């Protein structure tokens, strides 16, 4: 399920008798070839309960004022039955299906038919046709980077409708939120199933497919590494960025419009949530080329985890703060609001500058200054699946000398700010920081396991130079 990543590479596995960093030569990349019992249990748990978790949170707001405990208490004491809760849940509607179909169609058209022009006039922005990382099969895929353009055009249409055209109400997303949930699930399951069938019958590159022999694991984690239709429609890039992340800011705007409609004003907490989350969304699309070197693209196969997660989990659970504020319009004291804003901006600064330092170091091959000094690095080497020897440098200067994943630390600070903007009245808006802490800690450990196998003894030298993962002096 989508989240901010750090530059990564295909996973490797240590094998006795192999030289340092040579495991990749044995085909150990991407997700696991074999499934242990814990991984299988985790996969089955997520397949069964992740859709229920999304439904429970949205239902709790719709029927119980965003309380997570009252529905359980009502069921436990007999004051409500599951059938009663389900009966009060809005079903899928023809209107919601039309809205969602139009939305996805628009994003596909913007992705496929409109080459990027933003890079021609925006200084510093890298768009247009770009190359990704070397794949396990030794290929270098090309991508049309036009996410920022799609975001700008989509929001231009949104504001033109709101202020000039009047084709639909700005509250249209909130007003159809649960019916749209069923549509998002249909797309999520459809694309995940199609991707699995494609991996078996007509993969883009059969050398980059993995089969464990376990249906549930293959479905969840994916079979194909880089599934594509034609030359340019890349499943990972499209579903990671569109339709979920482009929609993120539109969803928040619709929630703000609903707050205005219900109460006659928009609270400073809603403004904070819209601003802080919009900063992340814009950062994602401004740095979409950098995203090609992250874990999602360079490590994960495309399965239900990404397909359903990007269609359902991301747009519905990452926007809980705005949804909560529709039901509970919190007006924060000025000092508190400023504190939340500063926390969010500081977290973003750390997140962005940490990634910028690594990107600068890689682009210049170390011929640069970080914090006014020549950067230091640990020299590493590894072998890719095609047998070629590669050399890398692991940066140990700047923020990368503070902790090995300090970009995640900044990410968590920003995530906490989103939640703090909602005050302390309910647990529901704090789900995001809890989820992100678990997700990023898991990614941190997973990436370190992969790097330890990939770089071997060189990784030990790196961890000795930078001993902490996320929190200096603690973890």
Curated annotation (Swiss-Prot):
Where in or outside the cell it occurs: the entry states:
Endoplasmic reticulum membrane
User: Part of which pathway?
Assistant: Steroid biosynthesis; cholesterol biosynthesis
Tell me what reaction this enzyme catalyses. cholesterol + NADP(+) = 7-dehydrocholesterol + NADPH + H(+); 7-dehydrodesmosterol + NADPH + H(+) = desmosterol + NADP(+); 5,6alpha-epoxy-5alpha-cholestan-3beta-ol + H2O = 5alpha-cholestane-3beta,5,6beta-triol; 5,6beta-epoxy-5beta-cholestan-3beta-ol + H2O = 5alpha-cholestane-3beta,5,6beta-triol
EC number(s) per UniProt?
1.3.1.21, 3.3.2.11
The protein's matches in Gene3D superfamilies, at most eight in alphabetical order, are given as:
1.20.120.1630
Q: Which UniProt keywords apply?
A: Cholesterol biosynthesis, Cholesterol metabolism, Endoplasmic reticulum, Hydrolase, Lipid biosynthesis, Lipid metabolism, Membrane, NADP, Oxidoreductase, Phosphoprotein, Steroid biosynthesis, Steroid metabolism, Sterol biosynthesis, Sterol metabolism, Transmembrane, Transmembrane helix
A Pfam family found in this protein is ERG4_ERG24
| One BP term from GO | cholesterol biosynthetic process via lathosterol
UniProt GO MF annotations: 7-dehydrocholesterol reductase activity; cholesterol-5,6-oxide hydrolase activity; NADP binding
Does the record bear tRNA processing in its keywords? no
Q: Give the sites modified to Phosphoserine.
A: 14
Q: Output a single Gene Ontology CC term carried by this record.
A: endoplasmic reticulum membrane
Q: Where does the chain bind NADP(+)? A: 358, 362, 395, 400, 407-408, 447, 451-455, 462
Signal peptide range in chain numbering: none
Q: What is its main location?
A: endoplasmic reticulum
Q: Where is this region: Disordered?
A: 1-21
Indicate the transmembrane segments per the record. Answer: 40-60, 151-173, 178-200, 266-286, 306-326, 331-351, 420-440
Subunit notes for this chain? Interacts with DHCR24; this interaction regulates DHCR7 activity. Interacts with TMEM147.
Family membership: Belongs to the ERG4/ERG24 family.
Function, as annotated: Oxidoreductase that catalyzes the last step of the cholesterol synthesis pathway, which transforms cholesta-5,7-dien-3beta-ol (7-dehydrocholesterol,7-DHC) into cholesterol by reducing the C7-C8 double bond of its sterol core. Can also metabolize cholesta-5,7,24-trien-3beta-ol (7-dehydrodemosterol, 7-DHD) to desmosterol, which is then metabolized by the Delta(24)-sterol reductase (DHCR24) to cholesterol.
Q: What is this protein called?
A: 7-dehydrocholesterol reductase
Organism from which the protein derives: Bos taurus
């Amino acid at each position: 399920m989508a989240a901010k990543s750090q530059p990564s590479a295909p996973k490797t596995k240590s094998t006795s008798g192999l030289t340092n960093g040579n495991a990749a030569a044995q085909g150990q990349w991407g997700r696991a070839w074999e499934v242990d019992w814990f991984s299988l249990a985790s996969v089955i748990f997520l397949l069964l309960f992740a859709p229920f978790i999304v439904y429970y949170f949205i239902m709790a707001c719709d029927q119980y004022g965003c309380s997570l405990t009252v529905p359980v208490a009502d069921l436990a004491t007999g004051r409500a039955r599951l059938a009663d809760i389900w009966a009060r849940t809005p079903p899928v509607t023809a209107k919601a299906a039309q809205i969602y179909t139009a939305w996805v169609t628009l994003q596909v058209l913007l992705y496929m038919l409109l080459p990027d022009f933003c890079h021609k006039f925006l200084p510093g922005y890298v768009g247009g046709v770009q190359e990704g990382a070397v794949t396990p099969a030794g290929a270098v895929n090309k991508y049309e980077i036009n996410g920022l353009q799609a975001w700008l055009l989509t929001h231009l249409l949104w504001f033109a409708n709101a202020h000039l055209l009047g084709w639909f109400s700005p509250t249209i997303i909130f007003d159809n939120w649960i019916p749209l949930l069923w549509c998002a699930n249909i797309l999520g399951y459809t694309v995940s199933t199609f991707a699995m069938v494609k991996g078996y019958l007509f993969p883009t590159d059969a050398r980059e497919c993995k089969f464990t022999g376990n249906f549930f694991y293959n479905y969840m984690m994916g079979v194909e590494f880089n599934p594509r239709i034609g030359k340019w429609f890349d499943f990972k890039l499209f579903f990671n960025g569109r339709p979920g992340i482009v929609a993120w800011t539109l969803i928040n705007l619709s929630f703000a419009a609903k707050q205005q409609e219900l109460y006659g004003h928009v609270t400073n907490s809603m403004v904070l949530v819209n601003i802080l989350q919009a900063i992340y969304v814009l950062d994602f699309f401004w740095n979409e080329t950098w995203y090609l070197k992250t874990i999602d693209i360079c490590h994960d196969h495309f399965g239900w985890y990404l397909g359903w997660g990007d269609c359902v989990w991301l747009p519905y659970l990452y926007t809980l703060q705005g949804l909560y504020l529709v039901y509970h319009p919190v007006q924060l004291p000025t000092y508190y609001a400023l504190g939340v804003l500063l926390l969010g901006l500081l977290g973003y600064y750390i997140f962005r500058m940490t990634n910028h330092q690594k990107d600068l170091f890689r682009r210049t091959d170390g011929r640069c200054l970080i914090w006014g000094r020549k950067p230091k690095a640990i020299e590493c080497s590894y072998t890719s699946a095609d047998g070629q020897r590669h050399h890398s440098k692991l940066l140990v200067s700047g923020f990368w000398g503070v902790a090995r994943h300090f970009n995640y630390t900044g990410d968590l600070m920003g995530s906490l700010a989103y939640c703090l903007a909602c005050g302390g009245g309910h647990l529901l808006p704090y789900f995001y920081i809890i989820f992100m802490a678990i997700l990023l800690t898991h990614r941190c450990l997973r990436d370190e396991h992969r790097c330890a196998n990939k770089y071997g003894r060189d990784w030990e030298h790196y961890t000795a130079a930078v001993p902490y993962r996320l929190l200096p002096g603690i973890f």
